[in-house]
Amino acid sequence: MIRRTLTTAAAACSVLLLVGACGAPASGGASDEPVGDPVSGGSATMIQVREPVSLDPATLSNNWVGQSLLGNALFGTLMIDNPETLEIEYQMATDFSTADGGNTFTLELQPGLTFTDGTPLDAEAVHLNWLRIADPDMGSSSLPQASQISTTEVVDDTTLKVVMANPNPMFAYSITNSTLNWIASPAALEKGRDAFNNAPVGAGPFTLTEWRRQDRMEFTRNPDYWDAPRPYLDSITLLNVPDGSQRVNMLASGGADLASETSWTALARAEDAGLGTELAPVGGGQYFAMNTRRAPFDDPRARRAVSMALDLDDINVAAFEGTGDVPETLFPESSPFYKDIPLAENNPEEAQRLFDELAAEGKPVNFTFLATTLPETKATAEVTQAQLAAYDNVNMNVEAVDFAAFIPRNIARDYDMMISSANVQEPDSTLWNAFHSRSMGNVTGISDPELDAALDAGRVGTTPEERDAAYEIVQKRLNEVAPAVWYTRAAPAVMTTDNIHGIRMYSLGSPIPAEMWVTG
């Protein structure tokens, strides 16, 4: 069984923000036998799903399908969260707190932090990094999080005052699930992106010694890392392997020790091969985002028709060999926010009636699904196309592009439908970003006053009852306005062999290389 780490008791802690110093439990590799204390030395080969275009943290993604292994190795973290309890554990930061309900925060840093070029990692460095991510011209995937900040003010070397555009007492989670958590040397960034790619500078547990593009990255231990005796490893080799089957085969054959994983199919094969698997607990999931800014999905009937036309269990079989987790509700039953409110209804007869009604009005549902070339993404788009081909008055084309071409299309909102995700732990940081009309991360473009009001209420609610009532309305409105077809829970996971230990993930499947160590 794929190892899921969320329990009902732990999930109850997510109702309100808890700030503390206790971390998530570390877990081992393929074996659950005790392995003793961490051992320094040795090297590990790890796999990430997607190679970065640049090493500038503004261009990276801090999640399991992005470059979390790379970012955490090179830059370290300001803070992390425990996916089980959602407690915040401070790292290079020592405090991030609000005294006025999330209107302002004070970020405190450890004194004496330095980048590997000898320059200080101070409040000014955080200020400059966050300004860059908030610049729309940077095209950062973390713009939705950074854009919530109105201003930052350097108080002293270790103190940064953060003023929010709107109150958000849950903003710590927008740091842990984004590249706001990764701070690069401003002096190195000022030399330009090409120079930074050749010689990136962070304050993380490892430094980059070589980048063979389309192949691998080599890292060595940073002897001046702030959290001695970590890191335990002397070196890391980071490979880029986009295919899930190949990732499993490499671990099973001894070609790698750990891999970030996105695929339910690959996770099932990994367990069959005797490998270890760890899955970060999430609700929500991946969805077909219908662009409500333009036809045909500016008409809610078109959105409902497509939603009701699709058989999600068949998509699971075709795309994931039946191993995926099709979400029936926004929150899993273990969540304190769970309500038995269905995300979708398969109703082919009503779908065809709506397709016919729209066609009679001169508005047939013709659209293009923008997909990446990742195998499962492309397969999901193609099986969706095949299902809709069984209906009259609807036509779906598939356009598959590589990730470098996908990003500018996403930023420009130049698509009819594409795959997006809202993977829910602390609900505010995900749901507000994904579906609030003011959010720069609202890929569907949905604008619904009742949904907005509920998302705002969930963000600022001060009691479990207030937040629960708000997110019940959110669940109802997402069902009613239908901006998305939720087709699978995400699989933010790692696969491991039995000789690597100290595996810990924060937020959306972001592994922490500083804590890993090897035996054998």
Regions flagged by a language model, labelled:
Residues 177-231, 235:
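Gly/Pro-rich hinge or "lid" segments in bacterial periplasmic/extracellular proteins
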Residues 298-386, 473:
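Append "and occasionally in soluble cytosolic enzymes with long acidic Gly/Pro-rich linkers
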Residues 356-424, 464:
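Ligand/substrate-recognition segments at binding pockets and active sites
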Residues 395-400, 404-406, 433-498, 520:
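Extracytoplasmic/peripheral linker and loop segments enriched in polar/acidic and small residues
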Residues 494-520:
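Long beta-strand-rich cores associated with HINT superfamily self-processing modules
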